[in-house]
Amino acid sequence: MTNLSVIAKPYAKAAFEFANEYNLLQEWSKQLKSFAELVQDDAIAAIISSPEISQTEIINTVKDQLDEKFFNFVALVAENKKLSILPEISFQFENIRNVHNNIKVADVTLAYAIDKNTLANLKTKLEEKFSCSIDMNVIIDPVILGGAVIKVGDTVIDDSVSGRIETLKSILLS
């Protein structure tokens, strides 16, 4: 775990537990993602890191636009001068949410785009294999030449042409 994730995880866990208790997971997920994107903007990041303006003052400018409970959470983060880690808090929140909902994320790397039916079939097969719901991130990377590389958690399934070539190459060289 990186230092950033160690700092962010307690915030994410507290946010998740609160949102789950009050049935606000969807709303808090969206709001955390929005704030995470906001603090990654270069101009906003410069303001946040400025010693001339407190992070609490920055958050107070959007107080009227936020749900009171979510504002209180973000205000706590600001009070602790941790607004810059909101992207990691959001990431950790989603990880906790996925575990809670028995969802795994599959990064599917393809050489070229494929049709929706094939993607749906692949998703169904992955859900059967891993006995859970799957959220798929499709990445197009022509370097793999064909086939697919699928990463789900610590499991990697490399059925790419480039992977097969590398395997064949190592066999021939040994």
Swiss-Prot record:
It comes from the Bacteria. One of its GO terms (molecular function) is proton-transporting ATP synthase activity, rotational mechanism. It is a peripheral membrane protein. Keywords: ATP synthesis, Cell inner membrane, Cell membrane, CF(1), Hydrogen ion transport, Ion transport, Membrane, Transport. It is found in: Cell inner membrane. InterPro entries: ATP_synth_OSCP/delta_N_sf, ATPase_OSCP/d_CS, ATPase_OSCP/dsu. GO terms for cellular component: plasma membrane; proton-transporting ATP synthase complex. The keyword Ribosomal protein does not apply. It holds the Pfam family OSCP. Its main location: membrane. The keyword Ion transport applies. Signal peptide: none annotated. F(1)F(0) ATP synthase produces ATP from ADP in the presence of a proton or sodium gradient. F-type ATPases consist of two structural domains, F(1) containing the extramembraneous catalytic core and F(0) containing the membrane proton channel, linked together by a central stalk and a peripheral stalk. During catalysis, ATP synthesis in the catalytic domain of F(1) is coupled via a rotary mechanism of the central stalk subunits to proton translocation. This protein is part of the stalk that links CF(0) to CF(1). It either transmits conformational changes from CF(0) to CF(1) or is implicated in proton conduction. F-type ATPases have 2 components, F(1) - the catalytic core - and F(0) - the membrane proton channel. F(1) has five subunits: alpha(3), beta(3), gamma(1), delta(1), epsilon(1). F(0) has three main subunits: a(1), b(2) and c(10-14). The alpha and beta chains form an alternating ring which encloses part of the gamma chain. F(1) is attached to F(0) by a central stalk formed by the gamma and epsilon chains, while a peripheral stalk is formed by the delta and b chains. Belongs to the ATPase delta chain family. This is ATP synthase subunit delta. It comes from Francisella philomiragia subsp. philomiragia (strain ATCC 25017 / CCUG 19701 / FSC 153 / O#319-036). The gene is atpH.
